[in-house]
Structure formats: C-alpha cells, structure tokens
A protein has these predicted regions:
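Alpha-helical segment proximal to the catalytic Tyr-Lys
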Residues: 129, 173-174, 226
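Conserved glycine-rich cofactor-binding loop
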Residues: 9, 16-18
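Residue(s) in the substrate-gating loop at a strand-loop-helix junction
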Residues: 144
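Active-site helix of classical SDR
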Residues: 124, 160
Length: 249
C-alpha cells in the first residue's frame, strides 16, 4: 500500500470492470477511500472485496449516472459516509458497436448520450459544489480517441466523447479560480469487456491495458502540476503506431 492519496476520497463511476475497476484499485492502493459506482452491484462488490482484502477501503453503490435523482442521492450518501469527495473519476460509458453514423438507431443515440455525456455532467453538477466550497478537488473525465479522430462506425459514441472533451475544457476554466482542477484521458483501443471482439486486425500485437490508463489517472490525481487543468492526455498506444486510426475504449 502506498500513501500518495492518503486521506483522499475518490468516487469512480463504471468501477465494476475494465478501466474503472483498474483506476479504483490503483487509487485504493495509494491510500484513497474509494466509492465504486455502477449499474450492476455484483461486480462492484467483487472489486470492493478485492480492495479490502489488499488492505484498502472501498464501498460499492448501485448507480445509473443518467438518473439525476440517483446521482444526487449517491453523492449525498458518499459525502455523508466519508465527509467529502476529493476526486471524481467520470468513467461510466457504453457503446453500440458497428453502427454507421447515418443509420444509428435513435434509441442507441439517446442511451449513449444519456450515460456518456449527461452522466458526466450530472456527477460534476452534484460533486463540484463541495469542491468549490473547500477550494480544492480533482475531476478526471475519461474521453476517447474517438473524441479527437472521427470514426465512421461509432457515430453516437464519438459524439458523446467530443462532448465530454468540450465540457471538460469549459468546466476547467469555470472552476479554476476555486482551486478545482479538471483534466481528462483519451484512451484508444483498450482491452476491456466493452471492446471484446472488436480489436482491429492491423492493430498490432500490443493492446493497451486498463492498468495503463489507471496509472495515467493516478498521475492526474497525485502528480500533475498544480496549474495543469483543462488538459487531456492522449493514450493511443501501439494501435496508433500501427497506422490504424485509434478506436474507442
């Protein structure tokens, strides 16, 4: 166990698997109390058990980030349990694979917008007031290479991530005077359940792992310069070196 985040409380959305799980484990390993949130409680409980068995502190909370009532309630309960939230990691996201932009079903578009973009906004909306009041806090929003490079087959997902990037940079400017830093990560292809079976044949033998993204998140939470805000770190990895346009996480 390390102590880079000792006495800090981190809320991680989409923490039951993949990138969110890895970020939660890394932050707990550096001393943070971690609130794990997601739509399915069972994987969250499993991650919490893993963290606790390693000597860390974690709790699990069922949460649909697209629901304002649920976000408000869970943020209130976490703040009541641990007194504050120091670090917010907006990781929760979904993707509908292989849907051409022009024929994206409306229900798929709406669902991705609700979770990926609205969910990020709602969590910030209900966590930031306490950070602003304390004049300190860190927000880490997970974007995607699809938010910087157009993807013909991931239209809705790419649009949500373009939105997350734009929202992040605007939010950073508005809360900077209050001591709150807002940054993000743009992963490319990461080996997670969400990308299972989607790895391009020309992407090369290497594939970015969730732990790689988690280490970058730890940098933003513990090592980033005090004046670093409104910035995204691109993590396209070996996929980009292969010449294949990076795809979504």
């Amino acid at each position: 166990m390390g102590n880079l985040l000792a006495d800090k409380v981190a809320l991680v959305t989409g923490a039951g698997r993949g990138i969110g799980r890895a970020i939660a484990i890394v932050m707990a390993g550096e001393g943070a109390k971690v609130a794990l949130t997601g739509r399915n409680i069972q994987p969250l409980d499993q991650v919490a058990d893993e963290i606790q068995q390693a000597g860390g502190d974690a709790t699990s909370w069922q949460l649909d980030v697209s629901s304002e009532n649920q976000v408000e309630d869970v943020v209130r309960k976490i703040s009541g349990l641990w007194g504050k939230i120091d670090i917010l990691v907006n990781n929760a996201a979904i993707i509908h694979h292989d849907t051409p932009v022009w024929s994206t079903p409306i229900e798929e578009w709406d669902e991705e917008m609700a979770i990926n973009l609205r969910g990020t906004f709602l969590c910030c909306h209900y966590v930031l007031p306490q950070m602003v009041e304390r004049q300190e806090g860190i927000v880490i929003n997970i974007g995607s290479s699809s938010g910087t490079i157009p993807e013909s087959e991931f239209g809705a997902y790419g649009a949500t991530k373009w939105g997350v990037i734009g929202y992040t940079t605007s939010l950073a400017r508005s809360v900077r005077p209050h001591g709150v830093r807002v940054n993000g990560l743009n992963p490319g292809w990461v080996e997670t359940g969400m990308t299972a079976g989607q790895k391009p044949k020309d992407a090369g033998p290497e594939w970015t792992q969730p732990q790689d993204i988690a280490r970058a998140a730890l940098f933003l939470a513990a090592h980033a310069p005090a004046d670093m805000t409104g910035q995204f770190i691109n993590l396209f990895g070996a996929n980009d070196r292969s010449g294949h346009a990076p795809g979504p996480i």
